[in-house]
């Protein structure tokens, strides 16, 4: 399972509290101009919310360096306005979305430079959910730079702070981060143990269903690396329950979560040479519209299943 895919999917979705308004449309510039007009003529929370929507529009275009430069300016303006109004919640959101923008541009040094001050801000203002999300991004930056020592140190610090607060969600998030550090080093057994403990804690809290289903996906990947196929199959009932809980909480279907489960089962049956069952899950994957599963992985599976049938 791709480590970086998780980061974009989970943290983009979990951190941002609003959807991109009209991001799929062709009138982005018109929307930006309209929001700038609103910002100019509004005050208070309306002004901050308009900044919030404006930087979301630019975040959909951050692959463009010029748009990223503009986004950084908008972040600065939004931060200044939040400080002027004394709105620490919106100020914290600015910092979080700035870090997400850097992670999605692979700007790991920027994250390592900026995140510590933002984490101090979150601690001071007791914005713990954002604290855990952004601490995860700092750990991510170290992992993707290959600095596993600092990644592990930050994950331990994150866990200790959560444990001190008796915050099970925070402890689970820290364990997730630790497991990812093992994942990128192919330390499968240690990864497995961390994800099992993480999952156990996440079942006791609400609001982290996306991370819970991703933890199951990574756990299956770790078990596959250890050829523990029976253990993968044992996980399936509770994995399905986790996805169902996610869908109920979100109020919509979660095709990516199902896709990760189907990939785990497809690969399990391919590895154990039960190609008929593997084919069933390949068909389910083909039925998921716009799934994010690797085209190479699907092509490989299709070839192996076809070859097995002579």
Regions found by a protein language model. Name each.
Residues 22-310:
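A "functional boundary" signal
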Residues 9-19:
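Bacterial N-terminal signal peptides
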Residues 1-11:
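Bacterial N-terminal signal peptides that target proteins for export
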């Amino acid at each position: 399972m791709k480590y970086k895919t998780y980061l974009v999917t989970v943290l983009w979705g979990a951190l941002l509290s609003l959807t991109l308004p009209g991001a799929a449309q062709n009138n982005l510039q018109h929307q930006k101009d309209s929001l700038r007009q609103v910002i100019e003529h509004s005050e208070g929370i309306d002004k901050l919310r308009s900044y919030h929507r404006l930087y979301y529009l630019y975040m959909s275009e951050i692959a463009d360096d010029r748009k990223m430069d503009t986004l950084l300016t908008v972040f600065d303006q939004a931060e200044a306005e939040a400080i002027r109004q004394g709105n620490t919640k919106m100020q914290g959101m600015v910092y979080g979305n700035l870090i997400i923008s850097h992670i999605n541009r692979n700007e790991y040094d920027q994250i390592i430079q900026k995140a510590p001050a933002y984490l101090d801000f979150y601690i001071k203002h007791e914005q713990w959910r954002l604290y855990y999300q952004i601490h995860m991004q700092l750990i991510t930056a170290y992992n993707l730079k290959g600095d596993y020592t600092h990644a592990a140190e930050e994950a331990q610090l994150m866990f200790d702070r959560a444990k001190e607060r008796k915050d099970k969600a925070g402890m689970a998030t820290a364990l997730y981060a630790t497991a990812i550090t093992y994942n990128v080093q192919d330390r499968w057994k240690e990864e497995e143990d961390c994800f099992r403990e993480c999952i156990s804690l996440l079942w006791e809290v609400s609001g982290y269903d996306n991370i819970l289903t991703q933890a199951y996906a990574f756990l299956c990947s770790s078990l596959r690396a250890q050829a523990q196929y029976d253990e993968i199959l044992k996980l399936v009932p509770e994995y399905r329950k986790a996805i169902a809980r996610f869908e109920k909480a979100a109020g919509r279907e979660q095709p990516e979560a199902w896709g990760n489960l189907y990939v785990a089962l497809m690969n399990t049956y391919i590895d154990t040479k039960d190609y008929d069952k593997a084919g069933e899950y390949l068909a389910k994957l083909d039925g998921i519209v716009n799934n994010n599963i690797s085209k190479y992985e699907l092509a490989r599976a299709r070839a192996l299943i076809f070859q097995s049938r002579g």
